[in-house]
Design a protein with these regions (language model features):
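Contiguous, glycine/small-aliphatic-enriched amphipathic segments in soluble metabolic enzymes
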Residues: 1-114, 155-247, 251-265, 271-274, ...
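Small-molecule pocket liners
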Residues: 33, 113, 127-128, 136-139
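A broad structural signal for alpha-helix termini and local helix breaks/kinks
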Residues: 46, 120-121, 145, 172
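Ligand-binding beta-strand-loop-alpha-helix segment within the catalytic cores
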Residues: 49, 130-158
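Short, flexible loop segments at boundaries between secondary-structure elements
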Residues: 119-136, 269-285
Length: 305
């Protein structure tokens, strides 16, 4: 399908509201967009200025429980993702879902990325999380796991960085991207005094990547790296690096969200179809009040135009 498919996320959160606001703001041609949603859910949260195609996901409007985590909402979220995988659109944009709602519905995935990995990946493809705010980009080497369970090997790093190079070549049209690798430990381990992950895992991976022609730094202290990245972002300057490689979730997300806020876009790479999503959650606390800021959704849609 040669359209951008947009899911509206958890029907009890802000997903439908920000989708409606974003599409009305962007004023895109009707033949470019297909919504994976439910007309009753859309009508509950607002009015679209254009009649975009809608692929209906069953949902009883009596099950809309604004701001609540429910099994019915989790099932709707999951079925929306299944449908978008089935139709294989040009690109995918997903509004936020509640992981605990999907768990209540019996779908034990730690996020939308993991669902896409299961139903879209083939031939050993790996879905990766790349966060983007203009030219400030962060790749996560690990995703939704407890900090004590963060697990890295040289082989994992080699595969993820190789996939990242392909994305920069094909999607961003950057033929020779420059990457900065964050150290795993404080001060990049201080020559093994504060941990050996740099010596045993990261540095061997970097040497092998460099031998393949990848422009990637040795492990560098993350705090210093991200201070410089933030300064470049605020000044609108070209960054020293095309992407920063973070070892675990919060190492990468705290800095980019601190400087870019809701304009941060979550991009799934490594599959045949690029998927983007706002860098925020369901915002149950403000759902149904018509006060949700659509800028994150606008950025997510623009990223795949």
């Amino acid at each position: 399908m040669d359209k951008i498919a947009i899911t509206t996320g958890d029907p009890n959160g802000i997903g439908a509201e920000i989708t409606i606001k974003a599409l009305n703001e962007l004023d895109l041609p009707q033949d470019k967009i297909v919504l994976i949603s439910n007309k009753d859910v859309l009508d509950y949260y607002g009015k679209l200025d254009k009649k975009y195609d809608i692929i209906e996901i069953p949902f009883d409007k009596r099950d809309i429980k604004v701001g609540k985590v429910t099994k019915e909402a989790g099932e709707f979220s999951f079925q929306s993702l299944l449908k978008v995988c089935e139709i294989k659109p040009k690109a995918i944009v997903t509004a936020p879902v509640a992981k605990n709602a999907m768990y209540l519905a019996g779908h034990n995935f730690n996020g939308q990325t993991e669902v896409l990995q299961k139903y879209l990946a083939h031939d050993n493809q790996l879905a990766e999380m790349l966060f983007v705010a203009n030219n400030f980009r962060v790749l996560l080497l690990t995703r939704h796991c407890a900090l004590k369970d963060v697990y890295l090997t040289k082989e994992i790093i080699l595969k993820k960085i190789t996939n990242l190079v392909k994305t920069f070549n094909n999607h961003f049209n950057i033929p020779n991207p420059r990457f900065a690798l964050c150290g795993f430990n404080p001060h990049s381990g201080e020559d093994g005094i504060l941990g050996r992950e740099e010596i045993d895992i990261l540095i061997p991976a970097v040497k092998e990547l460099q031998a393949l022609g990848v422009d990637i730094s040795m492990p560098l202290p993350a705090d210093t790296l991200f201070v410089k990245a933030g300064n470049h972002y605020f000044k609108g300057e070209k960054d020293d690096y095309d992407c920063y490689i973070a070892n675990y979730h919060d190492q990468g997300l705290i800095p980019i969200k601190t400087v870019a806020g809701d304009k941060t876009v979550n991009m799934t790479i490594g599959l045949d179809i690029i998927r983007t999503s706002p860098g925020h959650g369901t915002a149950f606390d403000i759902a149904g009040q018509n006060i949700a800021d659509p800028n994150g959704m606008i950025s997510a849609i623009r990223a795949v135009l």
